[in-house]
């Protein structure tokens, strides 16, 4: 009779250490976020609160597969930065995610597009040398790469940046800083105050034109 060869399967999950600041490095509280697994932001990666941050919830037990299908769990929450601007996401698989800001702190411009985060690990080829309990060491997880693609709408134009995130292979984490810019929200973000200011400016111009026309008529 034959024998089944020994095989070692090592599964890792990863962590994102998020920090929310303004363009002067002031820590921002209560910026709201949701995480998605698709570009259109229709398949939400549900998370629940824990003492250490927000933990990804597996949809398998909810009638779905990975991050699609199934019912929304009652314990799923929207993420928010704390008083120190921190939000931590735990239990992520490798792959691409879309971090969408759903609400910015008062007085700041909300990000219009989701941040595209890609997590790419490299594992050892010496799988049989792994011993249970070794965790993220050079025997198992050799490298961890993470990138962020950010679109910003500034000065009337889009700017796109690709950034290599700082990672820690020993704990499987990546650090990302999300920036909100100071200033009144532009009309594209739905700021009523800006619309009122623009309306007042239009009225002023119309009144000035009417006054000039009246003066011309008197001279004639």
Model-derived features: positions:
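Solvent-exposed loop/turn and edge beta-strand elements of beta-rich ligand-binding domains
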Residues: 1-220
């Amino acid at each position: 009779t034959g024998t089944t060869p020994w095989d070692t399967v090592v599964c890792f999950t990863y962590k994102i250490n998020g920090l929310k600041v303004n363009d002067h490095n002031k820590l921002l509280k209560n910026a709201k976020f949701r995480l998605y697994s698709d570009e259109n932001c229709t398949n939400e990666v549900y998370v629940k609160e824990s003492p250490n941050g927000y933990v990804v919830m597996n949809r398998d037990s909810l009638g779905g597969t990975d991050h699609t299908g199934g019912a929304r769990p009652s314990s799923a929450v929207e993420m928010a930065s704390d008083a120190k601007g921190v939000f931590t996401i735990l239990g992520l698989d490798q792959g691409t995610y879309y971090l969408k800001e759903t609400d910015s702190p008062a007085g700041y411009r909300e990000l219009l597009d989701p941040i595209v985060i890609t997590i790419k690990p490299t594992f050892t080829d010496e799988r049989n040398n792994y011993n249970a309990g070794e965790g993220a060491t050079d025997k198992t997880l050799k490298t961890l790469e993470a990138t962020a693609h950010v679109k910003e709408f500034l000065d009337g134009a889009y700017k796109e940046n690709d950034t290599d995130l700082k990672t820690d292979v020993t704990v499987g984490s990546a650090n990302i800083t999300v920036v909100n810019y100071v200033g009144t929200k532009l009309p594209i973000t739905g700021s009523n105050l800006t619309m009122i200011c623009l309306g007042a400016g239009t009225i002023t111009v119309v009144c000035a034109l009417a006054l000039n026309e009246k003066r011309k008529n008197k001279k004639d």
